[in-house]
Amino acid sequence: MANLLENFAAHHSMTAGAKKKADHQDTSVSQDSGYSDSLKGFSPDSHKSGNFLETVTEGYENSENIDPTLILSPIKYELSWGADTRESKQLAPLYETPRVGKKEFSLRRRLLISKATSGGNLDFDVSVCSAESCGREKSLRRIPSHEGSLSNSFADSPRDGSYEPIATSTLKTESESGTSCKKWRLSFAQQRSSTLDDSKSDSIPLPEVENISPVQHSLASSTDDSILYEETIFGAPTTPTCNFIVKEEFQTPISNLAANFRFNLCTPDVGHVSDFDISVTEDSAFHSLSLDKSQDSITDHEGSFQELIQKPRETSKAVNNKSRLRKLDRCRRLSTLRERGSQSEVEEEGNEVPVLSSAYKLKVARASVDEENEFSSDESRVHSLLSSDDLTGKPALRVLHEMLLRSTRKRPQQATVQDLLGSSGCFELPEDSLSRLIGRKMGLETFDILAELKNRNLKHILASILDLVNAASICSMCRVSRDWRDVVLQDKSAHQRRKAYIKKLKTEAEQGRQLSFEDSATRLNILSRSALRSVQIQARSAFRTPTSSLTPGDNKSIHSASKHQEYLKVAKTLFTDEALKPCPRCQYPAKYQALKKRGTCSRKDCGFDFCSLCLCTFHGSKECGTGSAKRIPKKEALPGSAQSKRNLKRL
C-alpha cells in the first residue's frame, strides 16, 4: 500500500508539472503581440490538457468520499496509469510532435512550449488567465510538486541539454538579432517543423516527408545523415509535451531554419519566381517592388506561406493573358508612332527601310506571331502592288505611287504630273503616254480644251467646232494664243473665212475715210452703220445752235472733238444722285440733280445754271415763270421728227 501511494504521488507530481507547464505555455503565448488572447480559449491543446486534469481532479474528489487518508483508489489508479502508459507506448516510436486534426499551430508557439518545458533561460510571467485554471491549481496545491522528476524525464530525450532560443519577446533579443518581430513571425509562418535541434548532438531526427514548405534546403546537409541515424532509435522516451501539442508529419531542424533564414528571405527560389509573370516587367508602366516592401507585405499575412504562394499560381494564366494583351496594345502604339514619325524621316533620306525594325520584330515574335505576320503581309502587299514591273504601261498608277511616296516623305504635294513622274527615278515614262492619261488636269483653275485637242491630233473635232463660230470670232481666236492661231491656220475653211472678213474690213475702212464731214469721224469705227449715214450727216450740218444775246460764244463753231467722248469724260465724274443732260444753250453735257431739279453745264465757256423743268435760269423754290429761255422755232424741221411728220400729213 505504501509503494502504491508513493507511485501515485510521483504520478500526480508529474501531472502538476505538466499543468504548470501548460499554464506557462498559455501565458507566454498570450503575451506575444502577434497572437490574440482569444485563441487560447478555443485551442484544442487547452481542451485536451483540461480534460486530462479534470479526470484527475474528479477522481480525487470521489476518493475523498471513500477514505480521507487515500488520495485515489487503487482501481482508478491502475486504470489511469494503464491508459497513460498505453498512450505513451503508442507515441514513443515516432519521436515527433503529434498533430491534432482540427487546427495547426505556428512554429513559434511550439518552440515556446518546448522551451518552457525544457527549463531554458526564457523568462515568462506566469499569470492566471481563467477562473477554471485557478480552481484547478488550488485543488492540486495539496499535492507536493515534484519538479525534479519532471526535469529527469526530459533528460532522457534525444535532444541536447543546451538550448539557444531563436527569438524571444524581449527587446534585448530583438536588438541582437537585427530583425523585427514581424520578420521572425514571417519565418515561422514559412517554416513548418518540429522542435528537434540536431546542430550539436550526434543523434539524428526522423526523416522528412515530401517538402511542402517553399523554403528549400540543401539535400547534402549534415542533417540528412543524422535523420537516417535517428531513424533506428525507438526506445528513448519522448517529451511529456508530446501528448498535449499538435501532431506534425513534416519536420525541419531548427539549425537549418536559423542558418538559412536570412538567405531564404533575401534570395527566393528560382522555381517560385518563374511561376510569376516575368514579362510584366517589360512594360514601361511597370515598376518592380523592392525586397523590403515585398517582405512587409508578406508579414501581414498570418496564414501559411503555401496559401500566399498558391494564389499567384492559380491566377498565373489570367496574368499571362493580361500581359499579352498589354504587349499587343504597346506594339500597336509603337507601330503607329513608327509609321507616322520615324518611318517618314528614314525614307526621306532615300534609304528603303522596312516599316518594322529588327528589334521590334523580335519583340513582337515573343508576344504573338500573328502581329508580325499582319505587318509583314501589309508591307509585302504594298510592294507587290506598286512594283515597277507591274506598272510599265500604267501611268496613272505610277502617279499614284509617287504621290504616296511624297506624302510619306513630307514633300510639297502641289505638283504636276510631269514633276511627279520626273522625280521618281525608277520610272522612265515618255511624254506621249501622258496624253492618254484621263483626269490628269483635274483640279486646275484654267484648262485649254483646244490645246489639248491639238496635242491629241483631233483635227476633225476642231473642224466641227470652228464651223460653229462666225468669222469675227475666228479673228478673235487668232489673237488669244499661238496654239489657237495654229488651230485656225491648220483648218482651211476657217482660214479662208478669216481672210475674207479681213478684206471686207479694209474696204469699209477705206470708204469711211473719204467722208469729210465733222460728225463722220466718230462713226468710222462702227463700219456696220451705213443705212442713215448720209441723212445724219446732213442733219448735223444743217443744225445750228440758237443765236441769243446771253451767250456770245454760241455763234462759234462746235469743237471738232466728238461729243460722245465728252459725255464719257463727264460721266466718270458723276455722283450717285447726278445724271447727264444736254445743256439748253450749247448742247454740251450738263450735270443735273433730279431732286433739286437743277442742272449745270460742264463746259467752262458756258456754265449755264438752269432749271431742269422749264430750261431757264435756276429760280430756286419759285414756280417756273412764262419768260423761260425757250428755243426759237426752226424754219426747217428735222427729217424724221414729229414736226416733219405733221408737215407730211398736212401735205
From Swiss-Prot:
Gene Ontology molecular-function annotations: zinc ion binding
Purpose of the protein: Required to prevent anaphase onset in cytostatic factor-arrested oocytes. Inhibits the anaphase-promoting complex/cyclosome (APC/C) ubiquitin ligase and prevents cyclin degradation. Probably recognizes and binds to some phosphorylated proteins and promotes their ubiquitination and degradation.
InterPro entries to which the protein is assigned, alphabetical: FBX5_43, IBR_dom, ZF_ZBR
Species per Swiss-Prot/TrEMBL record: Xenopus laevis
Entry's Gene Ontology cellular component terms: nucleus
Spans annotated as Disordered: 14-42, 140-171
Entry binding sites for Zn(2+) 2: 611, 614, 619, 624
SMART domains assigned: IBR
Protein name per its UniProtKB record: F-box only protein 43
Residue list for modification Phosphoserine: 33
Binding site for Zn(2+) 1: 583, 586, 601, 606
F-box domain mapped to chain residues: 424-499
GO biological process terms, semicolon-separated: meiotic cell cycle; negative regulation of cell cycle process; negative regulation of meiotic nuclear division; protein ubiquitination; regulation of mitotic nuclear division
Residues making up the signal peptide according to the UniProt record: none
Pathway note: Protein modification; protein ubiquitination
Biased composition (Polar residues): 27-36
ZnF (ZBR-type) ranges: 579-627
